[in-house]
């Protein structure tokens, strides 16, 4: 049996219905998931476990309707600055999550660290391909960092940008945060 999920990056909206509808047909003894990028060495890899996901939408509010910043700037609260303060309180500059208990239960044994260290990652090549210099410091290596839950801002929506830009204080900001965990 083979199930292909082409909506995985948008939370698989059709999958629950398909699983319920075809539950008898999908019964099996095991589940094997093929996910993740091909390793840069082109060598085959095998991962034990996948990251799960949970998400939350945060909202901050300013005036009940958008206001002209020339008339109400420095008076009407801007929800963008409120959210930026909230978000910056969640992570250190080096990427480590500051939320109490966020990493509770994560233990990497010496044996597991040895396995992780044996993966032939060339992190300089990886960073060059993605065009950034300094990685976050949650783990000492790429492989170690994958063993910890991540905190990601998936999207922010507020105000106007591009050809619609205005000198307006927006009335609200919506931010979708997700946590992936092992």
Residues covered by each model-derived region:
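Fold-level recognition of mixed alpha/beta catalytic cores in primary-metabolism enzymes, strongest
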Residues: 1-134, 140-149
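Short strand-loop junctions, especially beta-strand C-caps/beta-turns
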Residues: 5-7, 156, 180
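Short, proline-enriched alpha-helix->beta-strand connector loops that line the catalytic pocket
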Residues: 26-27, 171-173
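Short, glycine-/Ser/Thr-/acidic-enriched flexible segments
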Residues: 37-39, 63-65, 158-161, 180-182
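Short beta-strand elements
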Residues: 55-60, 155, 166-168, 179
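Short, solvent-exposed beta-strand/turn "edge" segments of beta-rich domains on protein surfaces
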Residues: 75-76, 163-171
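A structural supersecondary motif
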Residues: 141-167
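Short, hydrophobic beta-strand segments
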Residues: 173-180
């Amino acid at each position: 049996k083979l199930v292909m999920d082409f909506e995985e990056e948008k939370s698989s909206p059709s999958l629950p219905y398909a699983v319920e509808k075809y539950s008898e047909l999908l019964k099996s003894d095991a589940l094997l998931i093929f996910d993740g990028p091909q390793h840069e060495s082109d060598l085959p890899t095998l991962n034990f476990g996948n990251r799960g996901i949970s998400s939350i939408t945060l909202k901050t509010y300013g005036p009940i309707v958008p206001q002209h910043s020339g008339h109400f700037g420095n008076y009407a609260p801007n929800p963008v600055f409120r959210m930026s303060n909230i978000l910056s309180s969640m992570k250190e500059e080096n990427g480590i999550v500051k939320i109490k208990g966020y990493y509770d239960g994560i233990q990497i044994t010496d044996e597991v660290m040895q396995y992780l260290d044996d993966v032939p990652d060339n992190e300089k090549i990886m960073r060059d391909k993605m065009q950034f210099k300094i990685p976050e410091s949650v783990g000492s290596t790429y492989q170690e960092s994958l063993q910890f839950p991540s905190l990601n801002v998936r999207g922010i929506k507020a105000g106007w940008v591009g050809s619609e830009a205005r000198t307006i204080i927006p009335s609200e900001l919506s931010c979708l945060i997700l946590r992936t965990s092992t």
